[in-house]
Structures are given as structure tokens and as C-alpha cells.
Amino acid sequence: MEDFVRQCFNPIIVELAEKAMKEYGEDPKIETNKFAAICTHLEVCFMYSDFHFIDERGESIIVESGDPNALLKHRFEIIEGRDRTMAWTVVNSICNTTGVEKPKFLPDLYDYKENRFVEIGVTRREVHIYYLEKANKIKSEKTHIHIFSFTGEEMATKADYTLDEESRARIKTRLFTIRQEMASRGLWDSFVSPREAKKQLKKDLKLQEPCAGLPTKVSHRTSPALKTLEPMWMDSNRTAALRASFLKCPKK
């Protein structure tokens, strides 16, 4: 799974996921399913945000990478992926500026057009079950919830899906392709089932004991489908901004 994650996701996303796990004392090399889940969630958050801007009239518009956008403001503020201290600083700043109610839990995004925080969910289960879990945890009508599944289903607060159909289709296609690639490598079942994940972890640990450090065949193989998985959706200008604002790791 670790090899798959490093091949499948943008290096910035992988780096952010590793940083987030280490912040909570978790090891991406051991908790590989969680590593994959965090990367997937981060990517969906970025895809949700990318190419969506607000023009000088306050209207929401979509601008593809490469188009002039100097006078445009990003519609969404990305909160997910930052360390907790910085994330709360951003949330507090938004609340002080806009007057919106401060959430009890860290949200994933802030929507400047609708003036609301957004909680993004990516589930391997039924969307309505995961939606209810999120709603029961947050217990706030002020935070908008939007859930995606790997099967193409989605659910949002008051059926308000925020984004246009094409943008949501891009996210659904990406999730479905990730699922297909995992399945083709025999990783999907363990990703979905905790029991299977534990069995797979035991197998992995046994395999690592006699040949620790040796590269696996998977790490040297990139399927044609994975080439299409390369996240070309990331706006090059925003990629640089993300690296600058999110990754503040001390140099070794």
C-alpha cells in the first residue's frame, strides 16, 4: 500500500499526509491504510478548491490553470493539511474577519462565496451513514457537510452540492480510479475492512523481517492506469503557494 500511495499521489500531498501522521505519533510505513485515506482526503479537498475563484463582482467563476487570474480571489480557503496551531489561526482569522461562528472542530475548507465552513468526507461505506456520523460529531448547522464515496455517490447538507457538476464528476472519477487501481493490486479489500487490514499488516511484517530494505516489485512497476492518475489538476501557481504555506519543516 505504501508503494501505491507514493506512486499514486502528488508528492506534496504525500508529504503533507506524512507530516500530519507524525504530528499524532503515527507511522505511515505501518499504518498504510490510514496513510492512503489521509492522502485521498487531502486530494479531494484540493480538487474541491482548485480552479474556483471569486471575481471583482463577488461572483463565483471557474478558471482553468494558465488563464490570467491576478484580480481573482480563491473561493475556498484550505484548512485541512495545516498543522493544528496554524489551522486554528486561520480559522480564528476567518471568524474575526467575516463574523461567522467559530466551529468546535477544525473544518476542511472555508467557502468565501457562501460564507461557511465546509467539512469534506470520503468514505468506503454508505454515504448516508458517514454523513450522519459527521453531523452527529459536528452538531452545527453552520458547517456545511459534503460526503463523497469511492462508488460515485455523494451527499451534502440540504442537497446543496456547492460545486458545478463537472467539478464534482472530476472528484468522483478520481476516487473511482483509485479504487480500481487498489483492486487491481489486491489492496482494496484490506483498505475497506479493518480485519483484512490487520491480516495484511501481519503478512507485510513477516515479509519484511527476512528481507528488510529490499525494494518490492511494485515499487518498480507503474501501470498505464497509474500514469493517468498523475494529479494534473493541481494549478501550478497554487502548488507553489501550498508548499510555501503548508510545508514549514526545518531543514536537516
Swiss-Prot record:
Site (Important for efficient shutoff activity): K202, K203, K206
GO biological process: viral RNA genome replication; viral translational frameshifting
Active site: E80, D108
GO molecular function annotation: RNA binding
Record localization: Host cytoplasm; Host nucleus
Coiled-coil annotated spans: none
Alphabetical keyword list: Decay of host mRNAs by virus, Eukaryotic host gene expression shutoff by virus, Host cytoplasm, Host gene expression shutoff by virus, Host mRNA suppression by virus, Host nucleus, Host-virus interaction
Site (Important for efficient shutoff activity and nuclear localization): R195, K198, K199
Biological function: Plays a major role in the shutoff of the host protein expression by cleaving mRNAs probably via an endonuclease activity. This host shutoff allows the virus to escape from the host antiviral response. Hijacks host RNA splicing machinery to selectively target host RNAs containing introns for destruction. This may explain the preferential degradation of RNAs that have undergone co- or post-transcriptional processing.
Similarity comment text for this entry: Belongs to the influenza viruses PA-X family.
Domain commentary: The probable endonuclease active site in the N-terminus and the basic amino acid cluster in the C-terminus are important for the shutoff activity. The C-terminus acts as a nuclear localization signal. The C-terminus is recruited to host protein complexes involved in nuclear Pol II RNA processing.
Protein's UniProt name: Protein PA-X
Organism: Influenza A virus (strain A/Chicken/Victoria/1/1985 H7N7)
Source organism phylogeny: Viruses, Riboviria, Orthornavirae, Negarnaviricota, Polyploviricotina
Gene name for this UniProt entry: PA
